[in-house]
């Protein structure tokens, strides 16, 4: 093995298998393009983007890591979102959550 070498399997690597997904229609009502990255908590995206935010809470774009989707002014399109994993705690972004997404219900 060469230092830094990455050895991958011969088969395709599937991402987000078994994770909850949903589709939402998003419209850019602003006058500037808006770009949203792959791991941005979609619920907290730019306010000029119109979509059902409550449905998107706890989800991010279902696209490859390090990529983004650009919404042009006046554009409307359907995007697929995937549920956040791990502890399901969100900090930063627009500061609208700053903690657990949902309290555990027993």
From Swiss-Prot:
Catalysed reaction equations from the record: urea + 2 H2O + H(+) = hydrogencarbonate + 2 NH4(+)
Protein name: Urease subunit beta
Subunit structure: Heterotrimer of UreA (gamma), UreB (beta) and UreC (alpha) subunits. Three heterotrimers associate to form the active enzyme.
Keywords, comma-separated and alphabetical: Cytoplasm, Hydrolase
Pathway: Nitrogen metabolism; urea degradation; CO(2) and NH(3) from urea (urease route): step 1/1
Coiled-coil features, chain-numbered ranges: none
HAMAP family (UniProt xref): Urease_beta
């Amino acid at each position: 093995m060469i230092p830094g070498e990455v050895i991958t399997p011969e088969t395709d690597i599937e991402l987000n298998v078994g994770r909850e997904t949903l589709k939402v229609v998003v419209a850019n009502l602003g006058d500037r393009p808006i770009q949203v990255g792959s791991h941005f908590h979609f619920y907290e995206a730019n306010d000029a983007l119109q979509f059902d935010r409550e449905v998107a809470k706890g989800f991010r774009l279902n696209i490859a890591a390090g990529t983004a989707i650009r919404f042009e002014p006046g554009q409307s399109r359907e995007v697929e979102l995937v549920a956040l994993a791990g502890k399901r705690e969100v900090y930063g972004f627009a500061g609208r959550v700053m903690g657990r997404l949902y309290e555990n219900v027993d």
